Amino acid sequence: MDVKSKHGHIKSNPEESLLFRNSVSKNIAQLSSINYADRNVQAALEQLSERKFKNEREARKQLPFEVFSDLIWTNGSIIKELSELSSQTLSVQSQLLKVKNSIDSYKNEWSKKTNDAQILLNSYETFCEEEALIEEKLKNIEIFEKNFVIMDDDLIHLTSSTDVDDRFYLILDKAQEIHDSSDSLFASLSGFVEYSSFEEIVKKMSRYIEAAFEKLFRCVQTELSDPQTAQTLEANSHLKKAFTKLFSEPTMVNKSINLIVQARQQILSTAYLTALTRGDFLSSSRPIELSAPDTVRFIGDLLAWIHQTIVNEKELVEALFAARKRQIQLNPFPPWDVPNVLEDQMNSLLDGSLYGICRPLSSRAQTSVLDLSDIVRLYNVIEILGFYREAFSKIVHDECIILRIIKTLEDFTYQRMKTVLDDELYTISNTNLSITDDLLPPDFVTTFLRNANSIFKIRGASLSVQGVDELPFKMLFMQLFDRILEICAAMTEDVRPPYKGIILMLNVLDSCTNYVGRYTFLNELFEYLQEKTTYYKNNLTTLLNNDYIAQAGLSDLLQKIADTTDDKQALKNYLHSWKWDQQIDKFSTFIRKTLSETIDNLQLLTSPIVTNQVLKETAISFVGAIETVDKALELSNLERRWPLSTEELLIAMNVDSMDTLSDIGQSDIDNLSVN
C-alpha cells in the first residue's frame, strides 16, 4: 500500500505496512474514545490550538489523520537519521582506528624520546655534580687563599722597612689568623694524618709574625726616643695602637713594658728635678726646694707632686691598656691574657715608671727628716706620710713600690723620733736629777708629756687613721713611758723614807694617765699605766703597813703570835712576859708623831683617789694587826687597853671609820700580819 502525504511517497515492506496500519488503527480507536471534556485533553487541545489548530469538530475529525501522517513522516525521518548515524558511526570507527594507530605511533615515538631524554637528564645530573664539585674546589681554593695565603707584596710590606700603617696591621692580623687556624687544624689532625703543608704554613707565618713584631717594636722604639713623644704618649693614638698590638703578643709584652718604663723614667726624673728646682711655669707653682727650711711643708709638697704624678701615670697606663682590655672582654682569651695577668702587667708598668722618682724622693725625704729634732714635727711628718699612703692606696695596687717607699719613710721617721727621744732621755739619765720637796714629777717628765700630748692631739684629729700604723705608734710610746719610769725609779733609789720615792712614782704615773686617758686610741697604754699605778700603790700600802707596825712596836709581837698559834700555853706565857707598858708608850709615840708625818706625806699624792685608797688599805691592814693582838690576848685571858679605840685609831689615820670597819676581814689581817 502506498501512502501519500504532503511529504511525498514512502515505500515500505508489506509486513511493515500491516503493522503500521494496525498501530494506526489502534491509536485512532483510542483517539475516538477520548473524553474531550477532560481537562487534560482540553489542555492538550489548547496546546494544539496554539499550534494553529482549532478545537472544532472538523478539526478533531482530521486530527487522527494528521497525527498518523505526522507519525509516519517522523518515523521516516528517524529511520533516515539512524541510517545517517550508522554511516557516521562507521566513519567515527574508522577515524578512531586512525587515532588509535596515531596514538600507538606517538607512544612509540614518545617512549623513544623519553629514553633519550632520560639519558640526557642523567648526563645533565652528572654534569651538575661535577660542576658543584668544581665549584666547591674553587671555593675551597678561594677560602685557602683567603685564610692561608698572603700575597707577596703584602709580605714585603709586613716585613720590610716601610712605615707602619693601617695596611700593616691588617696584614699582621691576617698572618696571625693564618698561623692560629693552621696550628689548630694541624693539631687536630696530626694524630691521624700528616699535613706537612700546614706545618710549613705555621712555621712560615711564625717567621713573618716575628719579623713584623720586631719591625713594630723598632718603630715604637724609634718614636719613643723623642722626649716630646714620650711625654705626650697618652695623646698619641698611633703609639697606643702599636702598644695594643705588642701587648697581644706574649713574647713582646715584657719588652714593650720595659721600653715604656725606660722612656717614662727619664720623663719623670726630668719632671721631678724641674718641680724641685724650677717649679711649673704653666701652673705658676714655685720650686719645691723653697720649702726645704720647713721640713713638714717640704715633704708635703713632695708628696703632693708625687700624688699628681701617680694620677697621671695611672691614667696613662689605663689608656695604653684600654684597647687590649676591651679585646679580652669581647673575645675568649688564652692563659697568658687572662684579666689577672693583664692587671699584673699594668701594675708592672706603673711600678717601673714610678721607680725612677722613688729613690731620689726617699733619699731627699730622709735627709730632711734627719735634720729634724722636734718630735712633734717629726710626728707631723708621719701623719703626712700616712695621709698620702692612704690616698695612694686608693689609686695603686697594694704592692706598689710607692706604698713601700712611703712605709719605709714612715718607719724611718718613727726611728728618728725614737732616736731623738732616746738621746734626750740618755742625756737626762746622766744628769744629776733631784727630787723636789713636793714630790711632783720632774720637769723633763712634764716637758715630755706636753710634747706627747701635742702628738696625741694630732693623732686624734688625724685624717689618716687608716694610713698611719697604730702598732709602731703604740710600741714607741710604750717604750718611752717605760724609759721615763725607769729614770724616775732610779731617782728614788736613795730617797728616805722609801715611801716618798713611791709617792713620786705614783705622781708621775698620775700625770701620765691624765694625759693618756683622754684618748681612746691609747687604751692599751692607759691600761698598762694603770697596772703600774696599782703595782706602786700596793707597794706603798705594804711599805706603810710594815712601817706602821715597826714604829708601833708590834713587829716582834705579831711574829711571836704567828709562830705560836698552835701552842696556846706558850703564847700565853709569852704575852704575860711582854713589856706592855713600853709597848703602850711606843704605840702612843707612833700615833702622835709617825702617823701624822706619814699622813702629811701622803697628802703629797696628786691623785685623791690613790691617796684615799692607800690610806684606807693601810688602815685596814694596821687595824687588822691590832685586832690580831687583841684576839691573842683574849685567848690568853689577858686584857690590855690601847690608847685609842679602833674607831678613834681610824679617825687618827684620816679614814672613814664606819666604812673601813666594814671592809676589815680576817683573811686580810692574816695576810698582812705575816708581811
UniProtKB/Swiss-Prot annotation:
Alphabetically ordered keywords of this record: Cytoplasm, Golgi apparatus, Membrane, Nucleus, Protein transport, Transport
Top-level taxon of the source organism: Eukaryota
Q: Name one Pfam family in it.
A: COG6_N
Please cite one Gene Ontology biological process associated with this protein. Answer: intra-Golgi vesicle-mediated transport
What gene codes for this chain? Answer: cog6
What membrane topology does the UniProt entry give?
Peripheral membrane protein
Q: What is the name of this protein?
A: Conserved oligomeric Golgi complex subunit 6
- Locations listed in the record: Cytoplasm; Nucleus; Golgi apparatus membrane
Q: Provide one Gene Ontology cellular component.
A: cytosol
Q: Please give the family membership noted in the entry.
A: Belongs to the COG6 family.
What's this chain's function?
Acts as a component of the peripheral membrane COG complex that is involved in intra-Golgi protein trafficking. COG is located at the cis-Golgi, and regulates tethering of retrograde intra-Golgi vesicles and possibly a number of other membrane trafficking events.
The record's InterPro entries line, in alphabetical order, gives:
COG6, COG6_C, COG6_N
